[in-house]
Amino acid sequence: MSFNLIVDQGNSACKVAFIRNNGIESISFLPGKAGQALSHLVAPHRFDKAIYSSVGLPDEEAEAIVRSCAAASLMMGTETPVPLRLQYDRRTLGADRLAAVVGAHSLYPNTELLVIDAGTAITYERVSAEGIYLGGNISPGLHLRFKALHLFTGRLPLIDPSGISPKIAEYGSSTEEAITAGVIHGLAGEIDRYIDDLHAKEGRSAVILTGGDANYLARIIRSGILIHPDLVLLGLNRILEYNV
C-alpha cells in the first residue's frame, strides 16, 4: 500500500500522476518544464515513493523537487533495472518506450504483446510472454505524415487531422481528400499489418494501443485492440515499485 508520485517529462509538456495502491488517482499536465508548477502541485502531499523520467536531458530543478517530496525516490536512467529482459541497445531506448512495454507486461503477463504508442512518432514494440522485450520499430505519426507532405512538396496543402472523420472515402475527389485518404488508409494498413503478423505467429496475444492519437486510430483499425492511454505512467510506477 503506497502513495506514489510519477513525473514524466516529455518534449513539450510534463505529465504528473498521483498513484495510490497501483491505481491512478489523478493526472496533471504541466506545459514546458515542470519546475515551479510541479513544486506547487506536490507541496500539499507527502509521498511514499517518487520517480522522475525525461525523454531528453533531465531537469535538475524537477529532480530536486521529486527527491524532496517522498520518503524514497528514483531518477530513471539508462542503467535503471526494469522487470524485463531487453534485446535492444538500452543506450538508445527512450524512457517512454521502455516504460510503455513495462506497463503493458505488468497488465498482461504471460501474453505475447504488441504495444503501439501513437504520438508524434508511432512506435511498435514486441514483448514475449516470458517477459523479453524483443525490440521495436519507429514510424512517422499521424500529424507528422500530414506535415511532411506539406513541407516537402511544392503545393500540397497542410491538412489538420483533428477534425477528420474515421469514415474516409477509398479514393479522394480533391487534393485535400486524396491526402487525407492516402495518409489515413496508409497508416491503418501499416498498423493492421503489424497486428496480423502477431496473430499469425503467436497463440495467446494482445495488442495494446496508447498515446495521444490512440482513440482516433482505434476507430480506423479493423483488428481488435486494447486501449490504455496511461500506459507509460503505469509502467513508470511499476519500475519504481521494482526498484524501491
From Swiss-Prot:
The primary site where this protein sits is cytoplasm
Q: Which GO terms describe its molecular function?
A: ATP binding; metal ion binding; pantothenate kinase activity
The protein's role, per its UniProt record: Catalyzes the phosphorylation of pantothenate (Pan), the first step in CoA biosynthesis.
Residues forming the catalytic site: D96
So what family is this one in? Answer: Belongs to the type III pantothenate kinase family.
Which positions does UniProt annotate for ATP binding? D8, Q9, G10, N11, S12, A13, C14, K15, T120
Q: Where does K(+) bind?
A: D117
Biochemical pathway: Cofactor biosynthesis; coenzyme A biosynthesis; CoA from (R)-pantothenate: step 1/5
Question: Which NCBIfam families does the record match to this protein?
Answer: baf, PRK13320.1-3
Q: Which reaction does it catalyse?
A: (R)-pantothenate + ATP = (R)-4'-phosphopantothenate + ADP + H(+)
Q: One GO BP annotation here?
A: coenzyme A biosynthetic process
The cofactor binding remark recorded in the entry reads:
A monovalent cation. Ammonium or potassium.
Q: Which InterPro entries match?
A: ATPase_NBD (IPR043129), Type_III_PanK (IPR004619)
Localization per record: Cytoplasm
Swiss-Prot/TrEMBL keywords: ATP-binding, Coenzyme A biosynthesis, Cytoplasm, Kinase, Metal-binding, Nucleotide-binding, Potassium, Transferase
Give the enzyme's main class according to its UniProt record, as a single word.
transferase
Q: What is its EC number?
A: 2.7.1.33
One GO cellular-component annotation of the UniProt record comes to: cytoplasm
Q: Which organism is it from?
A: Porphyromonas gingivalis (strain ATCC 33277 / DSM 20709 / CIP 103683 / JCM 12257 / NCTC 11834 / 2561)
UniProt name for this protein: Type III pantothenate kinase
Q: Which domain of life is it from?
A: Bacteria
Cell membrane: present as a keyword of the record? Answer: no
User: What gene makes this protein?
Assistant: coaX
Cite a single Pfam family from the UniProt record.
Pan_kinase
Q: Which cofactor does it need?
A: NH4(+); K(+)
Subunit relationships: Homodimer.
- List residues binding substrate: G94, A95, D96, R97, T175
